[in-house]
Each structure stands twice: as C-alpha cells, then as structure tokens.
C-alpha cells in the first residue's frame, strides 16, 4: 500500500508485543483516501462533493473531541470512524475534495457530528424510531 504523509511507528499502549502504525497526514490528503473508500466514483460529482464535506466535517469533529487522544491518534481507519484504506484515488473524488476545500458543516460555531453510512441496503429509518434515540 501507498499512503501520503508520514508513518509513525509506536509501541502499543495495551499490548507490549504489538506496534501501532499511525499515518500523520493533512486532512485534505486524508480525504483523498476516505472519499473513494466510502463512495464509488460512479455516484457523480455532486454526490462526491457532499461526501467530501461530510467526511471533512466528521474528521474535524472527531479531532476536536479528542476521541482517541489516549491512543495517540485522532481517527481510526475503519467504519468506527471513516474507512481510510488503500482505495485507489480517482480524479472525480479529488476534484470534489478540491472544489469543497475547507468547507465544513457548522452549528453554533462548531462542526456538527456528521454521521453517515455508506451502505443501507435500500432502506433507512427516521432516528425518532430508533430504540436508542434521545
């Protein structure tokens, strides 16, 4: 795999026989792996722009919450945060990221908690019907 930015190798804080590999990368470069990992290029440029803004907002929100500070990083590379894998960068996603550079969804001066999902099997439900809604 090829990743942008710097790779940091640190001992695991929970298991002395393991290491932790952390990719230190600028947010716009981070999005170049997240957007194509979360949404196919075939969805079109406007959908990719919306995805870029949602993904940027999500990452910034997690960063500001220091959700993983004790672990030494800001976001995970799985669906627990956003999928950040070795998906091939593509021109459409990169253009969408560049066209929305720096744009974040805000409420009361703070980034919103921009949760989204990449797979719904064609069905969604209003949050008010979810058994764990507030």
Could you describe each region identified by the protein language model?
Residues 1-134:
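Conserved, single-site charged/polar hotspot
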